[in-house]
Amino acid sequence: MGLLNSKNPQSKQAHILLLGLDSAGKSTLLYRLKFAETLATIPTIGFNVEMVQLQSSLTLTVWDVGGQEKMRTVWDCYCENAQGLMYVVDCSEGKKRLEDSRKEFKHILKNEHIKNTPVVILANKQDLPGALSAEDITRMFKVKKLCSNRNWYVQPCCAVTGEGLDDGFRKLTEFLKSYRRTRETLAIFKQK
């Protein structure tokens, strides 16, 4: 993976929340990014936390929170320190599951702790027949409307092959840099 790099002690850190329904591919995606290979995963009960060093000298602490229905009720608890949200959608699923995913996405965006944080939706499983495109997900999830107050991007990807992951994380790091500059500027004005 092109974004991975050796540890740099002077790198900046960012806390990223990785959410999506169960079986959307969150853990597969995270371990593909971290180890540049596909690892066998099991359903996440609770959460996984991994630190991923990017070439941009930014270290991401990625919180991969389980997507089972019972776990979704505690997603809000993980938002407090999040500086970015990556939401994974299984684009090959049926209408009911996609609608459930859309509802959960809409709900999590209402959390006060992440009201302006950047969002990247990873439109996963593009390798499967009939998978919805990034444009389809943008429309179905009403991303333009729901994310009008923040930077957002919808990236088609395949967690198994790694296709599109570099681009999605690169976009997120661009957003994070911009988000930090904005927050630092606001902090300066608040001090005056």
Curated annotation (Swiss-Prot):
Q: Where is the lipid attached (N-myristoyl glycine)?
A: G2
* PANTHER family recorded: ADP RIBOSYLATION FACTOR-RELATED
Tell me the subunit arrangement: Interacts with ARL14EP.
Which keywords, in A-to-Z order, does the entry hold?
Cytoplasmic vesicle, GTP-binding, Lipoprotein, Myristate, Nucleotide-binding
Localisation: Cytoplasmic vesicle
Its family remark reads: Belongs to the small GTPase superfamily. Arf family.
Q: What does this protein do?
A: GTPase that recruits MYO1E to MHC class II-containing vesicles via the effector protein ARL14EP and hence controls the movement of these vesicles along the actin cytoskeleton in dendritic cells.
Chief location category: cytoplasm
In Swiss-Prot or TrEMBL terms, this protein is called ADP-ribosylation factor-like protein 14
What's the superkingdom here?
A: Eukaryota
Output the Gene Ontology cellular-component terms.
cytoplasmic vesicle
Q: Which residues of the sequence carry a binding annotation for GTP?
A: 20-27, 64-68, 124-127
Give this protein's Gene Ontology molecular function annotations: GTP binding; GTPase activity
Lineage at the top is: Eukaryota, Metazoa, Chordata, Craniata, Vertebrata
The source organism is: Mus musculus
Q: Which gene encodes it?
A: Arl14
